[in-house]
Amino acid sequence: MAIIANAEVKTCVEAWSGKVSSGRHQFITDKLASFGGQDKGPAPYDFICTGLISCTMITLRMYAQHKGIELGTFSVEADFNANKEGREWISRRLSFEQTLTEEAHQKILDICQKTPVTKTLLRSVEIETSIV
């Protein structure tokens, strides 16, 4: 067994706020004011989205470098959604400054479904991916 990632959170004085440490990095987590927090940092579901989009960006850049492909500047955005019936899903959107061929478009969508964090989340969360 290998530890892939590690993080620790310690409570702050303010309700819902915590100081997160992950490796050399430290940041604050909190809830939105509308949920009783002070919105001093990302909320837990924000971290799920952040992990997914960070892994997507890194994986696509690694793939492009390995294949000698120029993807140019692009962004990845994600929303965590839930409905009254209890269904949860993530909508992931990629936006490229340059025009992609249909072949590149399909390959990118395929790669997105194979990123390490995507695979982890797919074991318990449905993920919808689109390029906008």
PLM regions with names:
Residues 1-49, 61-132:
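Extended beta-strand/beta-hairpin segments
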Residues 52-56:
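Alpha-helical metal-binding/catalytic segments enriched in His/Glu/Asp
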